Structure formats: C-alpha cells, structure tokens
C-alpha cells in the first residue's frame, strides 16, 4: 500500500482549515493515521516520541474547535507538539526534524504562523498565553488564547506565578493541563465525561452566573449553600479546588483520548469568558505498547525498529561525560555521607539513575524548579552537608539570582555539575549551553573548571567537592576523547593550568574540550598549547609567562566569546599593560540552529579546521602589523 493510500485522510487534513472541513465522525480515523505516521517517521529519523503519541486526539480537537492561527495555541516545552507540526502543513518535512536545515525540535515562530510562541524550556506557556490574551483584549480582538501544559511543567514556579496573575485579570484564557503521569482513574470515565460536558455547557454556565448575581446580592446565605453544593459535586469528579481558588473555572479531569468528549468540552469552553482550566488525562506513548510501558525511554529516541520490543542498545565505548559524573557521584557518596544529589527533573539526562537507586535517602528530584533546587542546596550546605546540583547549563540560567544571592554571597560549598555545556546539537538554541562561563565568571567566590577529557572531569568534580565554597564543573554532551578515568581521586591545584605542547611564536590557551583540536593545530604550526583547566581563578602566572615569551596569544573555548574565558584572559593582560595581540575563538554573538554537535562545531569555527583557519588568519594579520613596527624600531636604532 502506498503512503498516500495509508495516510489519505491525513493528507487531506494537511492544514487546520482542511481539518475543520472533515465530518466529526471521521476524526477517530484521522487520529489513527496521525499516530501511525508519527510512529513511522520518528522511528526512522529519531526525535521526541512518547509525549506526542499522547497528544494526538487533543491536538486534533484543538485545531478542530479553535480557529488557528488566529486563535493562539501555546505548547509548553514543545516535546508534545509533533502532531501539531504534522497538522499545520509540515508533515512532509517531519523526517528532517532536529536536523541541520530541518524542522525545529520545538514550536518556533520563524517556522510557521501556527507556532505563535517559541518554546523549549518548561513552564512558560501560561505566562505567554496570558500576555497574548491581554494584548488581544486591549485591541478588542476576539481571539482565544490557549496554553497546553503538562503535569511536569506545572511543577515549575513560573507556571504558578502566571496562574496567580491570570486569576486576577479575568482574562479570556484557557489552560489545558495535559496530565500524562497518572493513570486514568475509575472516575475518569463515562460519568465524569458526562458531568464535564454539563458543567462546561452554556445552560449551566448562564444559570451559574445568573444565580451568583441574584442570590449573591439578595440572598447571600442561599448563594453560599448553592456554591458549596456545586463544589461538592465538582469535588466528586475533579481535584480542582486550587484552581477555583485562584479564580479559574475548573473542568475535568476528562479522557484525553476521547475525541467526542474533547470536542464537546472545548466548544463549550470556547464560548465562555474569563480564565478557564481544563484537566485532560492522557497516556504518554499511547498506541505503541513499548512506549506505553516505558515512556521515559521513549521520550527522546534515535532511529529504532518499530517491531522490536525495546530500543537498540548503545554501542560499547568510552563513557560519556554524563556517565563519568554519575560514576563519580556514586563513588564519592560511598566515601562521604555528607554528599547529597539534587536534580530539577533530569534524573536520566544528568546521570543520576544509579545514585538514586543506591542512595535513595540522599537523592532529591525537586521537579522542574531550578530556582528552588539551588536555594534548597544552599540550605543543606548551611547545615554542613555537601550538595551536588546536577543541572544542564541552559537550565542553570533560570536560577541565576539564587546562584548569586543564596550560594555565592554566603560562600556556601555547593558543587554544580553542569551538563550540556556548549553546543548540544539536535535540540537547537533553546538547549545550548553557550553562556555559563560568561554569567558565572563575574560572580565573586565562584570556582569554575572546564575539563578537557574524561579523567579531568572526574578529578575536577572531586576538586570542586572538597573546595570550601561554591564550585562549578562544566562539561559537554556526549563522549570525550577517550581518556579512561582513574579510579583514584586527586584534587588539582586550584587556579593552575599546564603546558601540553611547547612551541614558539603563538601560545594557544585552551579551556575545556577544545584542547584536543588546539593540540592538533599547535602541532602543525609549532605553537605552544596550554590546558588552562580553570576559568576562575585564572592561572595568571602561566599567562604572564606565555605573554612574555610569545608574539601572540589565542584563547579557545566552547562558550560565548562575550564575557567568557578568553575575555578574562584579555582583561587580565590589559590590567598588566601587556601589549601582546590576543585572538579569541569561541561562540559568536548569534544563536545557532539545530544540527549534530559536529555540524554545529564546524559552523561555529570550533572544530579543528575552523580553529586552524582563525589562527592562520591571526598570524598573518599580526605578522603584517609587525612589519611597520619593526621598521620604525630599526629607524630609531640608526639614530
């Protein structure tokens, strides 16, 4: 059977306008095709799978009921938005998702008018949708703003800040909680769906509002009794008291895979005004048994065999930096009972699975709450414990005030194990760790290290752990150059680098993983190459020595040039009145799209070839500038 025949209905509903022309009784068939196409495509290309499988019916219902793109759908994070991309004219390009020049991993305003807000980080959707609703109200535009947020996203403090604000504004906002963690309990069935339809209907809504005005004004006692009765009825089927107290009309929970219930309820809610909250229960990985059984494993996948019962095993090889961290954490925890492990909902990604199993009483997953994670660690440190916060570079940005105010200002011994530093690859600019050196370097009391290989990563983690103050070790995604970590742990002398290659003319100062490429270039041009190790404090003695014995200095880092490690070197040399030319190689003042890590390093000029080009050009430029200076010097000598 050809793809056209297998996905005939999906092809006919390639845009929301065409979808809305379909008879409602054809939508279950469309859902089946959409789920099948999503499975087939992602199994070939890789990508985020389980979340999207769980939102197929919800996505169809939203585009069927609301007039997108005039009505705004804001998807929180965006992992669950693959069905949305398919139904908004991007089906043919789905195989390119997360690839260089392909579809973005997340909703992206530059990609489609149906992506009304760019996302990638969690818990932002309610704030954005509320802003859109208020903007529309100011211009008297009759649009609907809908935020779709998962139960994980709702653990983020920003989501509750937005909920608190929305309830006070009486904005025309609908929030949909996509609850895919709890199983569908017995009360989420026919009775609950029926009651949700009634409670969201026009008749009930009008009676409720009329009763509020009439009884509330003339018979407040009767109104209070009626209100309590209503809450009692709602309480039998919905855990919505919190949202009602915040000023929302709460409906649900309803079955997120029942298209009839979804469409009826959404139509009713579309016709209401003010802040509304709909609780929808879905199953992550819906329709594909292995993903339903293990949604965590199938959250983000590479290419895999649909007929297999499990994902392919990764090829054996040297450990990734994440695995090096996970092993060190367990080894250190066995030696020091003061060690505590903290993660903001990234147990698997940050390498804490084994630690959580071996030391469950010392493992804390705080949810998507980076600000809380950092101050929580500060509180533990203030009581004599040694917390380790395992966090992605891009997510540490969300806790910057806490890093300064609660940790560094009090000089508390919190170790930050910063994963995904630098360019991360397929997830694109929302997940790149391009700025951590820049935003940490200016904070007093911080100790900042960047390992060049797996063994240095292990030893730096130990160095930071025993340090009496805040420390950070930042390392990239994936594997290193293949240096096997030593079982022993030895602290590096703080603020000391090492010369790895002796040459003349040019001194290359490498910070972190670019060292391997720098050494290869240094061998070719006969340069000196230093492994700096520490971004703060810098090895000032080594920098002065190299400045005094070389014609030029080059710094290399996988971080933004602005404010990064190279900037620190330049600032120090300027303060010492050294007139030596300096070239900074790093990430330029731009956001890079998605691609493989290797592709992005090449685009950024941080692969071996790119570093060589920059250094060759710098040598030529400084040599040309030296000729007039030498000529002037020779003329002075003659006089």
Curated annotation (Swiss-Prot):
Pfam families: DXP_synthase_N (PF13292), Transket_pyr (PF02779), Transketolase_C (PF02780). The keyword GTP-binding does not apply. It comes from the Bacteria. It is an enzyme of class 2 (transferase). The keyword Magnesium applies. InterPro entries: Dxylulose-5-P_synthase (IPR005477), THDP-binding (IPR029061), Transketo_C/PFOR_II (IPR009014), Transketolase-like_Pyr-bd (IPR005475), Transketolase_BS (IPR020826), Transketolase_C (IPR033248), Transketolase_CS (IPR049557). Its EC number is 2.2.1.7. Mg(2+) binds at residues 151, 180. Homodimer. Belongs to the transketolase family. DXPS subfamily. This is 1-deoxy-D-xylulose-5-phosphate synthase.
């Amino acid at each position: 059977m050809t793809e056209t025949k297998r996905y005939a209905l999906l092809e006919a509903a390639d845009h929301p306008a065409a979808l809305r022309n379909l008879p409602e009784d054809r939508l279950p068939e469309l859902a089946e095709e959409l789920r099948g196409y999503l499975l087939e495509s992602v199994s070939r290309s890789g990508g985020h799978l389980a979340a999207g499988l769980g939102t197929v019916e919800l996505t169809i219902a939203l585009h069927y009921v609301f007039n997108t793109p005039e009505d705004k759908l804001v998807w929180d994070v965006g992992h669950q938005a693959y069905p949305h991309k398919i139904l908004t004219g991007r089906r043919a390009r789905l195989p390119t998702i997360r690839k260089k020049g392909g579809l973005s991993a997340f909703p992206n305003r530059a990609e489609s008018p149906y992506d009304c807000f760019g996302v990638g980080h969690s818990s932002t959707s309610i704030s954005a949708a509320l802003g859109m609703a208020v903007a529309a109200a100011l211009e008297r535009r009759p649009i609907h703003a809908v935020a779709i947020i998962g139960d994980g996203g709702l653990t983020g403090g920003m989501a509750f800040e937005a909920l608190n604000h929305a309830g006070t504004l009486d904005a025309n906002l609908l929030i949909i909680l996509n609850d895919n963690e709890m199983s569908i309990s017995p009360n989420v069935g026919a009775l609950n769906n029926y009651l949700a339809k009634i409670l969201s209907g026009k008749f009930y809504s009008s009676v409720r509002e009329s009763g509020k005005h009439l009884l509330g004004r003339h018979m407040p006692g009767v109104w209070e009794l009626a209100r309590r009765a209503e809450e009692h009825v709602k309480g039998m089927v919905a855990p919505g008291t919190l949202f009602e107290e915040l000023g929302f009309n709460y409906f649900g929970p309803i079955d997120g895979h029942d298209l009839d219930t979804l469409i009826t309820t959404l139509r009713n809610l579309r016709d209401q005004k003010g802040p509304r909250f709909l609780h929808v229960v879905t199953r992550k990985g819906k329709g594909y048994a292995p993903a339903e059984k293990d949604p965590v494993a199938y959250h983000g996948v590479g290419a895999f065999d649909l007929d297999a019962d499990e994902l392919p095993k990764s090829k054996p090889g040297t450990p990734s930096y994440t695995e090096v961290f996970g092993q060190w954490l367990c080894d250190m925890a066995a030696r020091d009972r003061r060690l505590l492990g903290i993660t903001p909902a990234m147990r698997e990604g940050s390498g804490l699975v084994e630690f959580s199993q071996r030391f469950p009483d010392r493992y804390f997953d705080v949810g998507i709450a980076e600000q809380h994670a950092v101050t929580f660690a500060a509180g533990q440190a203030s009581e004599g414990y040694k917390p380790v916060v395992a966090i992605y570079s891009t997510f540490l940005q969300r806790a910057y005030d806490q890093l300064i105010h609660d940790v560094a200002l009090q000089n508390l011994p919190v170790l930050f194990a910063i994963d995904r530093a630098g360019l991360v690859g397929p997830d694109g600019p929302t997940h790149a760790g391009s700025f951590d050196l820049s935003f940490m370097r200016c904070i007093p009391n911080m100790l900042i290290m960047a390992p060049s290989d797996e063994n240095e990563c292990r030893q730096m983690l130990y160095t930071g752990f025993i340090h009496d103050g805040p420390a950070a070790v930042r390392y990239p995604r994936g594997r290193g150059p293949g240096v096997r970590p030593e079982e022993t742990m030895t602290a590096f002398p703080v603020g000391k680098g090492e010369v790895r290659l002796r040459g003349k003319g040019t001194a290359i100062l490498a910070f972190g993983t670019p060292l391997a490429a720098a050494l290869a270039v240094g061998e070719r041009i006969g340069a000196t190459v230093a492994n700096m190790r520490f971004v703060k404090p810098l090895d000032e003695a080594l920098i002065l020595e190299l400045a005094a014995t070389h014609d030029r200095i080059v710094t290399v880092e996988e971080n933004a040039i602005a404010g990064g490690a190279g900037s620190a070197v330049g600032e120090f040399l300027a303060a010492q009145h050294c007139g030596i030319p300096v070239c900074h190689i790093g990430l330029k003042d731009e956001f890079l799209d998605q691609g493989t890590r290797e592709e992005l390093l090449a685009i950024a000029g941080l692969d071996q070839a790119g570093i060589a080009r920059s250094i060759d050009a710098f040598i030529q430029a400084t040599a040309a500038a030296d000729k007039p200076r030498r000529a002037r010097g020779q003329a002075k000598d003659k006089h």
